[in-house]
Amino acid sequence: MAITRWFFSTNHKDIGTLYLVFGAWAGMVGTALSLLIRAELSQPGSLLSDDQIYNVIVTAHAFVMIFFMVMPILIGGFGNWLVPLMIGAPDMAFPRMNNMSFWLLPPSFLLLLASSGVEAGAGTGWSVYPPLAGNLAHAGASVDLTIFSLHLAGVSSILGAINFITTTINMKPPAISQYQTPLFVWSVLVTAVLLLLSLPVLAAGITMLLTDRNLNTTFFDPAGGGDPILYQHLFWFFGHPEVYILILPGFGIISHVVAYYSGKKEPFGYMGMVWAMMAIGLLGFIVWAHHMFTVGMDVDTRAYFTSATMIIAIPTGVKVFSWLATLHGGSIKWETPMLWALGFIFLFTVGGLTGIVLSNSSLDIVLHDTYYVVAHFHYVLSMGAVFAIMAAFVHWFPLLTGYTLHSTWTKIHFGVMFIGVNLTFFPQHFLGLSAMPRRYSDYPDAYALWNTVSSIGSLISLVAVIMFLFILWEAFAAKREVLSVELTATNVEWLHGCPPPYHTYEEPAFVQIQSN
């Protein structure tokens, strides 16, 4: 296995594997950072030195989990592996650009880690708001390194998005309409469009911040006629689509997993699912200011953003009830991916309901920047995106490796993880309703109980992460080969065996369309 195979790869399967390994590694780093946060908050009083180092850890935790764990795994890993197989394409449309998309990430990660090590680190929160992120409150190179890190990660994602859009539209057999491609392919397509439209706005915002810090411009400085609120609009115009970018591929995965383990040949309401994803993608761009209800917008502006945000619940509800309808009447196989998928549906819905609460601008004035918000977005990320990743991994592991995971161990792992994340994040709703603010390393004694419970939950999640590594080792050590795969007629990624050959569909796929 020459080193060139991995450094110069133009093969979608190899690049997908690189993304998965990188994402798993970054996930360990992000988990370590989250445990530092929960250790600090496990008791009143100080563990680390001060709020600056605490906020550096919080900021790094967010960036690592979003840009180096969830996105590389869902889009780069499963997207690369599955999209070409699902549409019968020999590879991605631009295989070398695909390689570059991946190799921009390790330098980007390096820059982010470097930012923590110079001066006092970037303790700005992931939104990097000026004036805190300006050159007075954050003198030194920390924030600049963070900005360059984001630039690289952004270029990587934009190139990946171009690649996925071209591949999904252009590389499928001519006889097949877009409405005959699997839902995961659709989810990656919608995600890629969101990336392509939102990331340039982030790039503009952080570039202006860079020049404010180093070239004496005043885009975000009132002293020179600028406005820090402009930065917030630019950031959240990216930031809100970003959260849908994180969850949409998960929606696609859950559709596949639920249909497969219900013994159905397709999910319920295919067209409804597709349109729901497109609606979520569109609406995701016109709700950004709900992150800014406390900055003093007009009451009519707040009314609009409240209503628009609530409308997103409709296509999301279409998806949730379609998953439940897919289960209906099926012969359900209670295998581990199905457990992850059912956990996803329930916990994502809980997270969505707290999101509806927060969409009310009047309520959000009180709940903004409290642990209620932290609980909300960790329910949709730590139990939405992560559960989708786990469902996908356990479901497609035999396809990726040719080996099967130990079914009992993976079920125990699911149970431990389920208890861990819920024990970590459910109490945070109580803290938020008691007005405990985010981004502080210490708190009054009144909040001690639920913080201690939350920190114990984080240790249970750590046990789950270690169990997962053991399960992975066990599968490769035991080498149980795949015997047979069911439902391949409607799950075409499995058609070439486990694992598929290095090159698939070297000749164009022959497709016969049944006319109804």
Swiss-Prot record:
Its cofactor is heme; Cu cation. Its EC number is 7.1.1.9. Residues 41-50, 118-140, 213-227, 287-298, 358-370, 434-446 are mitochondrial intermembrane. Keywords: Calcium, Copper, Electron transport, Heme, Iron, Magnesium, Membrane, Metal-binding, Mitochondrion, Mitochondrion inner membrane, Respiratory chain, Sodium, Translocase, Transmembrane, Transmembrane helix, Transport. Disulfide bonds: none annotated. Na(+) binds at residues 40, 45, 441. Fe(II)-heme a binds at residues 61, 378. Mg(2+) binds at residues 368-369. Pathway: Energy metabolism; oxidative phosphorylation. Component of the cytochrome c oxidase (complex IV, CIV), a multisubunit enzyme composed of 14 subunits. The complex is composed of a catalytic core of 3 subunits MT-CO1, MT-CO2 and MT-CO3, encoded in the mitochondrial DNA, and 11 supernumerary subunits COX4I, COX5A, COX5B, COX6A, COX6B, COX6C, COX7A, COX7B, COX7C, COX8 and NDUFA4, which are encoded in the nuclear genome. Component of the cytochrome c oxidase, the last enzyme in the mitochondrial electron transport chain which drives oxidative phosphorylation. The respiratory chain contains 3 multisubunit complexes succinate dehydrogenase (complex II, CII), ubiquinol-cytochrome c oxidoreductase (cytochrome b-c1 complex, complex III, CIII) and cytochrome c oxidase (complex IV, CIV), that cooperate to transfer electrons derived from NADH and succinate to molecular oxygen, creating an electrochemical gradient over the inner membrane that drives transmembrane transport and the ATP synthase. This is Cytochrome c oxidase subunit 1. It comes from Cyprinus carpio (Common carp).
